[in-house]
Each structure stands twice: as C-alpha cells, then as structure tokens.
Design a protein with these regions (language model features):
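Conserved non-cysteine loop/helix-boundary elements of the Radical SAM core domain that shape
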Residues: 32-168
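Structural motif
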Residues: 11-13, 25, 101
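Short linear sequence motifs
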Residues: 13, 20-23, 37, 95
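Local cysteine-cluster metal-coordination motifs and their immediate loop/turn environment
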Residues: 17-32
Length: 169
C-alpha cells in the first residue's frame, strides 16, 4: 500500500550514502564511522558500486526514471579525489544521469579541496552543501568540530570563485 502512493511517472530520488567522516562530531546520531588509515575503503566502494548497479538494474527493469541524486553521509568529501570521481562517475553511468537535480554534501571544511569541488562540478552537480553547523568558534569546539568559522568562509569563497557554484548551503 505504501508503494502505491509513489509517483513513479515523475521519477524518484536516489541517495548515495558515504557513512564515514574524518572525526565523529559529539552531536552526531548518524550511522557513520571515522575513516582512518585502517579503513578498508576499497571494500566499501566495491560494495557500494554493486548496490548502485543492482539498484539501477531494478530501476531500468521497472521503467523508473531518476528525478534527482543526492550524495550524503557521513561526509562524502572524506573520500579521496580518485574515490569520489570513481563513485560519482559509476553512479551516473549506471543510472544514465541524475535527472533534474544533483547535490553533494561537501560536509566539513577539513575534507574539502578545490580538486574535489572541481570533480563534483564536472560530474554535473549543481548544488553543494558545506554544512557550517555554526559560525561560533566556541560552539564548534563544544561539538567537536575541528575547523573555524574562517575555514567555513574560505570553503564557501573557494566554491563560489574557483568552481563557480551558485547554489551553496
């Protein structure tokens, strides 16, 4: 009965989860882990790509159209540049695009690089979310975020100037 209410003709939204972060924020309630040198990201990415492949196959078999794609986390930008490009290009290839809207959660300033922003933009993402949480240094410290308000502002400036993002959150 629940699936009877889904408007398949207008498409569906695809969520790609990267459940890893550089550190764990004290307020976080998400099912995510800290990426360390011992984290087997190759195994996670292989499993994620298999999940993407199977999901895309089902969508094609059922005639479903993708309306939007969102990559969230955790912190998707905890992926290395090559990993980020691999996952995004694979998903776009399997699903044949992203529909009308494509957003990537860029997460934390300590994981964002110009190269990652360029990869995200080159894959077609029109929106990124940098998630400042707060611009108060004391609050950032209390919740376990290791960046500063200036780091947030610098990332926003980089996204606007270097990569020409206009839809920032």
């Amino acid at each position: 009965a629940l699936l009877d209410k889904v408007d398949y003709d207008n498409g569906y939204s695809l969520y790609i989860g990267i459940p890893f972060c550089r550190t764990r924020c004290l307020y976080c309630s998400f099912a995510s882990g800290v990426r360390t040198d011992k984290t087997d990201m190759a195994a996670y990415i292989a499993a994620l790509k298999e999940d993407i492949r199977l999901g895309a196959e089902i969508a094609r078999d059922c005639g479903f159209k993708i309306r939007s794609m969102y990559m969230g986390g955790g912190t998707p930008t905890v992926l290395k540049e090559s990993e980020l490009e691999d996952v995004l290009s694979y998903a776009l290839g399997q699903y044949g695009g992203y529909g009308r809207e494509f957003t990537v959660e860029a997460g934390r300033p300590d994981t964002i690089t110009r190269e990652k922003l360029e990869i995200i933009k080159s894959m077609g993402a029109g929106r990124i979310s940098i998630n400042p949480q707060t611009m108060c240094q004391r609050t950032l410290e209390l919740v376990g975020r290791s960046h500063t308000p200036k780091d947030i502002a610098d990332c926003l400036d980089m996204a606007r100037a270097a990569v020409s993002y206009t839809h920032l959150r």
